[in-house]
Amino acid sequence: MPQQQKESGIHMRFGKATAPKGEQPGTSRGVAPRGWRNRILAVGAAALVLPIAAGAAPMAFAAPAPAPVLRAPAGGYEELMVPSKMGPVKVQVQWARNGGNAALYLLDGLRARDDRNAWSFETNAMQQFSNDNVTLVMPVGGQSSWYADWTAASNTNGQKTTYKWESFLTEELPAFLEGYGVSRTNNAVLGLSMSGPAALRLAALHRNQFKHASSLSGPLNWGAPGMREAIRVMMLDAGRFNVDSMAAPWSPAWLRMDPMVFAPELRGLPMFISSANGLPGQHDRPAGLGGMYNTANAMGIEAISFVSTLAFQSRLKSLGIAATFDFPANGTHSWKYWEDQLWKARPQILGALGA
């Protein structure tokens, strides 16, 4: 498997990012064309060369050339600030190696940070796809959001903005990326833990956007006894968010987020779904009491994910819906195992996108 990729310094501004100092447009990491400047220059040049002569026959003005599309360079990494109902959202992007229009959305976990998407530094995801003709799209933020449109801002932690992540990922972000040559219809989405069921939901309910979905160690049976309260405890622990602000118990909004409920909408969609059993494996080397505690916690969470994934497998089977399921013999709820599973899912993702 490829080794961890080093991160690059990025100069960022709203709307689009500029290349690191010393790099010029047209290189593998150049900036997108300056559309408005080019349009003005083109119109000005056209005006200068129009024939103006006394007695000349009336002449129709040619329509100005369309503004060039903001197209990303082939390959390279940038950070974009994308407008949204929630305010500007940072999105880390690794552009397709050969300028292709396919994209893979990599969603973060329950403890998503506000500075970087963990896929970019906890795993070698960027290097895994560095030679592929697919753009990696890594939204930043969304702690405890489940990437959903909430009914209200959380009232247990003073949240001032209501989460509207589904709208961002399916409306605002694809519209923004389209200006860079990324297709609105040739995408895949992959999530882990919190974002596992979110990835399946986004693909199920937005079939025109996503051609493939993957869930790694996701809790996929929200109707299981005690699951809502388990989710409540997890969200309080990760940022003191209130699950009731996301969706009321058994409301249409809540049921819409339950994979067991929206499962029929997944028919015909290529899927990769996995969970380990929670038993320690090759990546578990706890050091000290703190390490042992973290490993024990990761074992328990993965075991819950494993049971719910088995239930979801049975649900799909009862509906006659095909999906690829992978259950490693060992593994806990941690990033190195998800890195391994991403590598397993990669060929299927690239095949679905034609990349």
Feature-to-residue mapping (PLM):
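Short, Lys/Arg-rich cytosolic juxtamembrane segment immediately N-terminal
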Residues: 26-38
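Non-catalytic cap/lid and distal C-terminal segments of serine-dependent acyl enzymes
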Residues: 2-16, 39-46, 53-355
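Short stretches within intrinsically disordered, low-complexity N-terminal or propeptide regions
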Residues: 19-21, 34, 48, 62
